[in-house]
Amino acid sequence: MPHILPEPSVTGPRHISDTNLLAWYQRSHRDLPWREPGVSPWQILVSEFMLQQTPAARVLAIWPDWVRRWPTPSATATASTADVLRAWGKLGYPRRAKRLHECATVIARDHNDVVPDDIEILVTLPGVGSYTARAVACFAYRQRVPVVDTNVRRVVARAVHGRADAGAPSVPRDHADVLALLPHRETAPEFSVALMELGATVCTARTPRCGLCPLDWCAWRHAGYPPSDGPPRRGQAYTGTDRQVRGRLLDVLRAAEFPVTRAELDVAWLTDTAQRDRALESLLADALVTRTVDGRFALPGEGF
């Protein structure tokens, strides 16, 4: 990043201008269909499940077909677990798909097929934590609640606190920081999604594009971009991990019309047989794979 001299000493704002941020968002936001008007609370909840630890570009390849196929909780609940796992494809973390299916079943059965709008009820649903509950309350039901992801924490750390990164999460502190920034109720949802977009596309972790930032004041810029004083960031490994092996084994089962033999599964990962065995046992324990009475393997519900 080019060095920019600190600005003259001023009393720094402890807010972010919603006018500037919302105007920038209208000009520059990505075309993400789950943010469009008319998207149902259920379809927003589906997007939040998919976006957990997954880039939006990968979700774009799955979400539109998913919500056309299963537009409501009841439609999703009637699908088989195997169909849900197949449709989830290579989004990763397939337990999310299973939990989404369970969540749909609970909403259809206990909530008259309507996604609850109360955060305290939302967090009782399978697979729904505090962040997802708040995202649904904000984006589906337009409530003025803080929605704090990694991108939001980074923007607040830099613009408000003058730090290169946010450090370790603290839910009470992070929620209080964002709640203090939220404008009045009518524009709070747009402000929240714009803050996320700013962190995802401009105020990024490794290569922030400060020249494109719409904020007219940033404490980090004002301080001369001090580097992080925390430990070096580590990239999240995938190659060679148990996650990769689990994915390879599930790929075999998703492609199979009938249960497969152990030998057919074994060829999916020949590098480390102990790791392969461990990955298979974990899939069985998570009920993402079933073993038939004759010792073959299948997706849940297909072990005939």
UniProtKB/Swiss-Prot annotation:
GO biological process: base-excision repair; mismatch repair
Top-level EC class as recorded in UniProt: hydrolase
Cofactor(s) needed: [4Fe-4S] cluster
Active site: 48 (proton donor/acceptor)
EC number: 3.2.2.31
Protein origin, superkingdom: Bacteria
Binding annotation for [4Fe-4S] cluster: 203, 210, 213, 218
Site (Transition state stabilizer) location in chain: 149
Bound cofactor: record note: Binds 1 [4Fe-4S] cluster. The cluster does not appear to play a role in catalysis, but is probably involved in the proper positioning of the enzyme along the DNA strand.
Entry GO CC: plasma membrane
Catalytic reaction equation(s): Hydrolyzes free adenine bases from 7,8-dihydro-8-oxoguanine:adenine mismatched double-stranded DNA, leaving an apurinic site
Residue span(s) of domain HhH: 111-139
Alphabetically ordered keywords of this record: 4Fe-4S, DNA damage, DNA repair, Glycosidase, Hydrolase, Iron, Iron-sulfur, Metal-binding
Keyword Cell membrane listed: no
GO molecular function term, any single one: purine-specific mismatch base pair DNA N-glycosylase activity
Function: Adenine glycosylase active on G:A and C:A mispairs, as well as processing 7,8-dihydro-8-oxoguanine:A (8-oxoG) mismatches. Minor activity against 8-oxoG:G and 8-oxo:T mismatches is also seen. Bind dsDNA oligonucleotides containing the above mismatches.
Family: Belongs to the Nth/MutY family.
Name this polypeptide is given: Adenine DNA glycosylase
Gene source species: Mycobacterium tuberculosis (strain ATCC 25618 / H37Rv)
